[in-house]
Regions:
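Interdomain hinge/lid region at the active-site interface
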Residues: 8, 49-111, 117, 129
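Beta-strand segments within the central parallel beta-sheet cores of soluble alpha/beta enzyme folds
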Residues: 31-39, 91-95
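ATP-dependent carboxylate/acyl-activation modules
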Residues: 124-130
Length: 130
């Protein structure tokens, strides 16, 4: 159960990072994007907690290590593969987390995955100063 839960958390963080990056690239405010997403069906813990607390302010200090998240994603993929689960989405999630681990190191916070997406998109997802 823990592996399934943490895989869903990893998937939510990765997908939310890409979705918000697309909006920022299109000129949207990432804080407002989170507010709108959180009022709809796309809401998840990345948009309700991780982005507002760690990504938008740029602190990247949510308190869960990159190495721990990648370990759980790897274990989930191994177990799911052993059960014959197709894993089209799972492999993609695993790939982006492995990339984030390589870029930011095992001691980094797992929210730094957003930096990997930012780098690829050529943007930053920070709260706009008022």
């Amino acid at each position: 159960m823990k592996l399934a839960n943490n895989f869903l958390s990893a998937m939510g963080m990765a997908g939310s990072s890409e979705a918000i990056a697309m909006g920022v690239k299109a000129g949207l405010d990432p804080s407002i994007m989170c507010d709108v997403i959180n009022a709809g069906s796309g809401m998840n813990t990345a948009t309700t907690q991780k982005f507002p607390r760690s990504v938008l302010p740029g602190s990247f200090d949510y308190g869960f290590g990159m190495a721990l998240m990648v370990k759980d994603v790897r274990l989930f993929l191994q177990e799911a593969e052993a059960f014959g689960i197709p894993l089209e989405v799972g492999r993609a999630v695993g790939t982006i987390w492995e990339k984030a681990l390589a870029e930011h190191g095992p001691q980094s916070d797992f929210t730094e995955l957003a930096k990997t997406v930012e780098k690829g998109a050529g943007i930053e997802m920070r709260a706009k100063k008022k």
